[in-house]
Amino acid sequence: MAYRIAIVGGGLGGLTAALLLSRSGHEVTLLEQAMSFRTEGAGIQLSPNASRVLERLGLGPTLAARATATTRSRFRHFRTGRTITEAVLGERAAMRYGAPYWQIHRADLHGALQEAAEATPGLSVHLGQAVRHDEIIHQGDQLSVTPVPGPFDCVIGADGIHSQVRRWCFGAAPSRFTGQVAWRFLVDSAALPSALKAPESQVWWGPGAHFVHYPVAQGRWVNCVAVQEAREWTEESWSLPGEPGALRSAFEGWHADVQALTHHAEEATLFKWGLFDRRPLPSWHRGPVTLLGDACHPTLPFLAQGAAMAIEDAATLNLALTRFPSLEEALSRYEGWRRPRTTRIQRTSRRYGWVYHLGAPIAWFRDRAAPLARARTMDWLYRYDPEAPDQA
């Protein structure tokens, strides 16, 4: 059965869902509050569980031309630089998991999805259309979203951690500060030694903090994310400018590679934000209205799975809406398929945030357990196919 679907939110999950659902024969209207699609942001790690969905959308060649193929992921000691554990990726990962591991700038990925959306018949995109929770009207069999003509059969909230659609479904829910703040910034690779430009992800573990970096934009930039423990934070935002001096001070005494990156941070790209968490929702849908991505299961960044979870959600939701004749059954099956995995990833990410920041002497035991734990986690994460959830 073909549905009339409104998707609120034009981020990575919303655009992926719009493309998949349109190509499955549904009539899709995408509502994005911004006047233009985002071009800011920083890097994203696209692991095989997400890249397989994008390849099936036909975006493989476009993304391969814009992304960096990750050769390995290394975890290092914050001061000595010693490699604690590493995972070989590249062709080996593509063969093992059936899809590539890419590092890509958010704007490059978003641009590829936007270009595909513009070329997709039956997909209507409305920019500058913010949706408030009180603008979703469900009376009897009629479902409408005030900013655009309806009616719709289904509304999908892909509008992020501050989701208005989630508020319509379940009311306002407070978020919890995790006690961690993060910086993100880009570094011009021309200013760096060759060791810092290698096509790999490096994660430095230190007491009370960690630091991640990898190249994006075909190696023109190195994307950096640094996380440090903090007592309080008053904003839940990605848009607060960071202070270069505070960043350098936070990682003073770390390995020379980390300090080289903090000293070459492009100030215009430096932002700081608090990491917030929410408890898993009791349900993901209310009537014909459902959620995906951060709107229903915001994920801390320690597994690099936030974008991947939204992309997986989109693929599984499309499968459910295409396979089952009843909308209620489709939304219930979508939730039933996805909830165990996303809840596990939320909990594992929280735990990794603690593990990454361990100090001596317990860090000694962590370092010796890391190789086996990392291999098990990678297999569970990356083998997953969101379009075959019965086999998970």
Regions found by a protein language model. Name each.
Residues 4, 27, 221-224:
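Residues at the starts of beta-strands that form the adenosine-phosphate
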Residues 237-272, 327:
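Flavin-binding catalytic cores
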Residues 71, 127, 207-209, 271:
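Short beta-strand or tight-loop elements
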Residues 8-23, 27-35, 156-157, 183, ...:
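Conserved mid-domain beta->alpha element of the FAD-binding
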Residues 371-392:
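C-terminal auxiliary extensions adjacent to catalytic cores
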Residues 1-5, 22, 47-188, 231-250, ...:
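Conserved N-terminal helical subregion
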Residues 61, 189-197, 233, 257, ...:
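Short helix-loop capping/hinge motifs at secondary-structure junctions, enriched
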Residues 199-234, 244, 251-253, 275:
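Active-site substrate-recognition segment that forms the wall
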